[in-house]
């Protein structure tokens, strides 16, 4: 299948024009190659997994490897990955905030997996787009919800902070929730599920009597891989897909 056809499929659901101005979603490494037979999917592209790229034609990640621009190509991990992809004729595409803001992404994943009702975007961009999801859940304790989140995202660890005795209204902010703590306090859900919070963020949610479940950033968005795989399988024929779920937390030891 042609690379432009694959990109067209992805952008028909997650248009890159909806990315944030600071983001680098879209085609990042474009080469003369047109035919795509094997695609590599991952949330992040890690140097530890570079050997897995040897026979792929295209890499699609959630987080863009090239984010704020490049001033030099040296011997750091990102530069080595860039050189490897160019040398091996590998097309590289990222769907980051263009993916985040659509209801068919993480919004639908968490809504379906947790059987949420009365849902809406946690942080609205407009009536049709936004970040995360708020919704109601039935008959699940806070601790059990933590186990469910750990299982559906294949997370290595989960932190659970019980700050009240309710667990009906949830606010889920996949990825970093640090910029949206004030939104959460204003919304007043029973429980917030997110990642990348600092000391004062956790303290503020405790003072607001809002339960908190923290997972690592990568795990909170691991569903990206399966969502993109499902889309590609539905709209393409004969393309081999390699899924990678490596995370920066793989080397973390819980003691």
Stretches found by the model and what they are:
Residues 1-255:
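Active-site catalytic microenvironments in core metabolic enzymes, especially phosphate/sugar-handling
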């Amino acid at each position: 299948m042609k690379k432009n056809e694959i990109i067209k499929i992805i952008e028909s659901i997650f248009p890159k024009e909806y990315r944030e101005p600071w983001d680098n979603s879209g085609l990042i490494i474009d080469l003369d190659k047109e035919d795509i037979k094997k695609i590599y999917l991952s949330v992040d592209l890690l140097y530890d997994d570079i050997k897995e790229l040897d026979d792929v034609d295209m890499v699609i990640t959630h987080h863009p490897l090239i984010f704020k621009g490049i001033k030099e190509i040296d011997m750091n991990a990102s530069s080595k990955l860039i050189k490897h992809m160019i040398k091996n004729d590998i097309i590289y595409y990222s769907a980051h905030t263009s993916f985040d803001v659509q209801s068919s992404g993480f919004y639908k994943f968490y809504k379906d997996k947790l059987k949420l009702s009365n849902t809406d975007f946690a942080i609205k961009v407009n009536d049709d787009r936004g970040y995360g999801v708020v919704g109601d859940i039935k008959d699940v304790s806070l601790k059990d919800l933590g186990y469910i989140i750990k299982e559906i995202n294949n997370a290595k660890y989960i932190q659970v902070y019980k700050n009240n005795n309710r667990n009906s209204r949830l606010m889920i902010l996949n990825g970093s929730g640090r910029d949206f703590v004030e939104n959460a306090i204003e919304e007043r859900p029973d429980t917030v599920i997110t990642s990348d919070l600092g000391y004062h963020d956790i303290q503020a949610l405790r003072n607001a009597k809002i339960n908190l479940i923290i997972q690592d950033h990568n795990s909170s968005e691991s569903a990206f891989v399966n969502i993109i795989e499902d889309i590609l399988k539905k709209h393409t024929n004969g393309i081999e897909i390699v899924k990678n779920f490596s995370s920066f937390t793989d080397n973390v030891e819980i003691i």
